[in-house]
Amino acid sequence: MTRLRSLGTGTAFAIAAIALVVAIAGGTIAGTIARPTPTPSPTPEPTAAPTPEPDTAPLVFALPLVTGCATDDAVWVVSDGGGIGRFDGTTWRLADPTLHSLVGAVCESDVVLAIGPAGRVLTIDDRTKSIRADDLGIVDLFGVSILPDGVLVVGSEGAVLRQTSSGWQPYARGLDEDLFAVVGFSGTSAWTVGSNGVSFRLEQAGWRQFATGTTATLRALAATSPTEAVAAGDGGVLLRFDGRWRPLDSGVTSDLRAAARVGPVTYVAGDGGVLLAVRGNDIQRVDLATTCPLRGIFAKGTDLWIVGSSGTKAAVWRRQGDKLDRWGAC
């Protein structure tokens, strides 16, 4: 203490100032050393953009489309010598590009069953997105109908087969004519029509023939019960059953190929773009503004769907009341 005083007041202040500067500098250095090096930001990994699904709708409408049907979630169309198309309510796409010869199709819930020559039966599961092919023999299949407990198909030379949980079994004997259309109500009730104007009704005792008054080939059939049906065929032949078959004046000479019931109306379609609306004995022409052969029609709820094709040009129409939509060009 004595010695510090002897230095004088000015000297003491100078020493204190130097000490303060050193202390500040030391703190700055220490602070610089203590500050952690910033962690570099990770470089983001590049992500590939999803590849857009190709538009295969044009391929669908280049197929020889013949008919279709509707599952719970989609509309399906099949072709005779091409692939299979699917419409999800917004977009058409080629669901299966494999070449198939198919002439008829029915849908139930999420399953499509399509038929064709040489006993070919194609089962499409819309839920699992799978396709299974079965062959029922050399018989050509032309018509198919859903039953409450299975499926009924008809074909060449009077062939009738029924599918149940036990598999496929013959379901008629003594029928010789080619059968082109069938509508089934149960295992003991159905209608079928075919070549030479034949018609048969399935009853408890078996298949019973009903005279139609024509020898024209009958290719189309729609029915709501065993006592109410409409059949149509070559040369514009149109018949209505109300206890017996009665001829109706179709007003056309085109071959009529398909029929479907929507509400109280039976629609009949055929060559030359012909579409007829049959209400009882009243018949009206529906103009689709096409001359394309109409090969198949079916219902989805109250909507009528029409399928037409000529060579590699095809189209599908949807009729909702007075509104008409079309996809494709035919």
Residue ranges of predicted features:
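Terminal targeting segments of Actinobacterial cell-envelope proteins
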Residues: 1-7
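Residue-level hotspots at or immediately adjacent to binding/recognition sites across diverse folds
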Residues: 8-330
